[in-house]
């Protein structure tokens, strides 16, 4: 990855939306690159970017695509406000500006190599951790067994369903476990909430865990992992929803002595234990 200066991160890059994929009824994935077709910038798994539309607004989004993909950068966006509603209304060819990469990243090189990895996601929370999975699959020989546990309200709400159910399991030593909250017609897979499903799967406690999802899911999944014998220093999460300006200047991401924009968004849970209970 080439060196990116702080000045580079401050300057918005013009991006063109090349393709839009309808993932679920309220989530779309936008594939964006520069006007000349080149990448907007390099990034690492877990980093974020600020997308702006002049006259509409700007927002912070995780980058769910792998850094090894040099054709385009992906953003999976749930419709939940003015900017996201506008983005859901556009067609390919729309110009946006993108500023990044912002924040730290998952330690895929320094800490994860050679280890068995458990990735846990819920709802749109699968987007920030997808980049980790994609990166590890692109460098499969560097990592041990990969397990992905992902849950959503219904089959229709499972983001990246085709990719996760058909493509990832074809990669050696890679296992995907999908669940939905309630029974529904046409679904013959597991039914139940992610925290309970993780406990049922009863994974060995030598895994490194990466987790992202709704706060209530994270709370009970972490408790379940502790019951199984995992330690908090084994579990990583991302707090990109707390990021605002992206450079630690506005102060709205501050938690105790940390600024999520600068010190995060990726943290281990033992690091979060040292902060005020504001997250």
Regions found by a protein language model. Give the residues of each.
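FNR/FR-type flavoprotein reductase catalytic core
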Residues: 3, 82-244
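Ferredoxin-reductase
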Residues: 2-94, 153-154
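Local cysteine-cluster metal-coordination motifs and their immediate loop/turn environment
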Residues: 216, 240-265
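Short microdomains enriched in Cys/His and/or Lys/Arg
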Residues: 120, 267-279
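Structural signal for conserved beta-strand scaffold positions within catalytic alpha/beta enzyme cores
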Residues: 19, 65, 178-180, 237, ...
């Amino acid at each position: 990855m080439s060196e990116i200066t702080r000045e580079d991160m401050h300057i918005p890059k013009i991006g063109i939306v090349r393709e839009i994929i309808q993932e679920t009824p309220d989530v779309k994935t936008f594939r964006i690159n520069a006007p000349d077709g080149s990448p907007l910038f390099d990034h690492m798994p877990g980093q974020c970017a600020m997308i702006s539309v002049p006259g509409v607004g700007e927002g912070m989004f995780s980058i769910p695509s792998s850094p090894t993909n040099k054709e385009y950068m992906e953003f999976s966006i749930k419709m939940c406000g003015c900017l996201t509603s506008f983005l859901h209304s556009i067609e390919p060819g729309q110009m946006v500006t993108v500023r990044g990469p912002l924040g730290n990243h998952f330690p895929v090189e320094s800490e994860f190599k050679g280890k068995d990895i458990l990735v846990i996601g819920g709802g749109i929370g699968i987007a920030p951790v997808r980049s980790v999975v994609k990166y590890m699959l692109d460098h499969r020989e560097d990592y041990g067994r990969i397990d992905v546990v992902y849950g959503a309200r219904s089959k229709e709400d499972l983001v990246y369903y085709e990719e996760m159910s058909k493509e990832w399991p074809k990669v050696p030593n890679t296992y995907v476990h999908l669940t939905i909250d309630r029974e529904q017609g046409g679904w013959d897979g597991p039914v139940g909430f992610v925290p309970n499903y993780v406990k049922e799967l009863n994974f060995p406690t030598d895994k490194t865990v990466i987790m992202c999802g709704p706060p209530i899911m994270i709370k009970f999944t972490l408790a379940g992992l502790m019951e199984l014998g995992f330690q908090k220093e084994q579990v990583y999460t991302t707090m990109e929803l707390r990021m605002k300006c992206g450079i630690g200047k506005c102060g709205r991401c501050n938690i105790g002595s940390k600024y999520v924009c600068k010190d995060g968004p990726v943290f281990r849970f033992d690091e979060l234990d040292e902060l005020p209970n504001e997250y």
